[in-house]
Amino acid sequence: MSKEEFPHEKDLKDEVTPDKAPKKDPKAASKEEVKEDPAKDYEKEIAELSAKNKDLEDKYLRSEAEIQNMQARYAKERAQLIKYESQSLAKEVLPAMDNLERALAVKADDEAAKQLQKGVQMTLDSLVKSMKDQGITEIKAEGETFDPALHQAVQTVAAENDDQKDHVVKVLQKGYQYKDRTLRPAMVVVAQ
């Protein structure tokens, strides 16, 4: 018999029987139930986004603070550069001042030498005045308590009394300060 002769009969191949029915996994069913609660997914996502937002906000605040610190450091460095702009020139001029002082230390015997010394003295005085106007001053050393920030001990001698201990007894080379910085420490002899 053919299918055409019995149209009301079904093809047994197409029929679903209990043993051919797709089996449902109980774990899959519970997963489907979990997926059905979208509120938990949104809460989790909100928590993650909040944490990420807090992290980004923290990074932003740190970056902003770092920028402010850099700007403050830049302003301070710029102020230091302006404050000490003449420092290198002053260091270059100090040896010339030393030479002028040495020239004045030589005894002048005749009138021509005395006139030359007078010119050297005027030049030195003018140079010292210009240095003072720029904030460059001589470090007071002789008779002062030895200060390693201002003095360089080249030699030590025995102190004649207790008051003289750790005091400068002789200056071998003058020292100079530029505002609050030591340009060149005074080379001194210290009593011990």
UniProtKB/Swiss-Prot annotation:
Sequence segments annotated as region (Disordered): 1-43
Keyword Cytoplasm: yes
Keyword terms, alphabetized: Chaperone, Cytoplasm, Stress response
Signal peptide bounds: none
Compartments (UniProt record): Cytoplasm
InterPro entries named in the record: GrpE (IPR000740), GrpE_coiled_coil (IPR013805), GrpE_head (IPR009012)
GO molecular function ontology, one term from the record: unfolded protein binding
Function: Participates actively in the response to hyperosmotic and heat shock by preventing the aggregation of stress-denatured proteins, in association with DnaK and GrpE. It is the nucleotide exchange factor for DnaK and may function as a thermosensor. Unfolded proteins bind initially to DnaJ; upon interaction with the DnaJ-bound protein, DnaK hydrolyzes its bound ATP, resulting in the formation of a stable complex. GrpE releases ADP from DnaK; ATP binding to DnaK triggers the release of the substrate protein, thus completing the reaction cycle.
Family statement: Belongs to the GrpE family.
Name this protein carries in UniProt: Protein GrpE
Organism: Lactobacillus gasseri (strain ATCC 33323 / DSM 20243 / BCRC 14619 / CIP 102991 / JCM 1131 / KCTC 3163 / NCIMB 11718 / NCTC 13722 / AM63)
Gene name, Swiss-Prot/TrEMBL: grpE
